[in-house]
Regions:
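A glycine- and small-residue-enriched flexible loop/hinge signal that marks low-structured segments
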Residues: 1-165, 204-206
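Extended, compositionally biased non-globular segments
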Residues: 151-207
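C-terminal edge-of-domain segments
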Residues: 208-212
Length: 212
């Protein structure tokens, strides 16, 4: 999670998101009141460095389960009473079209309010990956990472063990494939039970070269 200096939200680049950037999320929000706002306006901050809401985002992530979106209104209020952007501009003073562009095209993270709902919340849980990527949101990345770690934990003891080959096809024997898939599925079964997955299926390619 990265928090850059925002010199002007109206001139903030909105063409930085793209493929293969799922490990990056960019926070351009900060508080428009309280200590954060005072620090931003202080004469000691002559360079007008943003006093980012990065800490708030990290706090929400630490509280959220891997599959939960930090923009979930019911669960994750930010505690920021007056949302602003990193140049000190209040979110409420910014044109809605620009906010939409920063959100959907720029894929930035910042704080927003909702009509009829007290408090402020995250606009979304974007990564800087493509919006149509399987890894377009932080929770998608975190969930997949947990699945991979879990599978590795269960499968690692099988390394160096016997694998059997079908004498006719030269491919992995069906019972070897079934065994490895059953072992790997244990991690995903636990995640599904905990509500972190909607479903799962491990597939082991029987045609892979295991003897070379």
């Amino acid at each position: 999670v990265y928090a850059p200096k925002v010199s002007s939200v109206k001139q903030q680049a909105v063409n930085l998101a793209g493929a293969n950037q799922s490990r990056v999320s960019v926070v351009i929000g900060q508080t428009g009141s309280g200590t954060g706002a005072e620090l931003y306006k202080d004469k000691g901050n002559a360079a007008k460095a943003s006093v980012s809401g990065l800490g708030v985002v990290l706090g929400l992530l630490s509280r959220a389960k891997v599959h939960q979106c930090i923009a979930w209104i019911k669960e994750f209020p930010t505690g920021v009473s007056l949302p602003a952007f990193g140049d000190g501009t209040l979110v409420r003073d910014v044109d809605k079209a620009l906010i939409e562009t920063l959100d959907t095209t720029g894929r930035y993270l910042f704080f927003v309010t909702h009509t009829g709902q007290a408090g402020s919340y995250m606009n979304d849980s974007h990564t800087m990956d493509s919006g149509i990527s399987d890894y377009a949101t932080i929770e998608s990345v975190r969930t997949m990472d947990k699945a991979v770690r879990g599978i590795r934990t269960y499968v690692k003891p099988e390394l160096g063990g016997n694998v059997y080959v079908d004498p006719t096809t030269g491919q992995l024997a069906s019972y070897t494939v079934a065994h490895l898939e059953t072992v790997a599925n244990q991690a995903l079964e636990a995640m599904e039970r905990d509500g972190e997955l909607s479903g799962y299926k491990v597939e082991v390619d029987p045609a892979q070269h295991v003897a070379s």
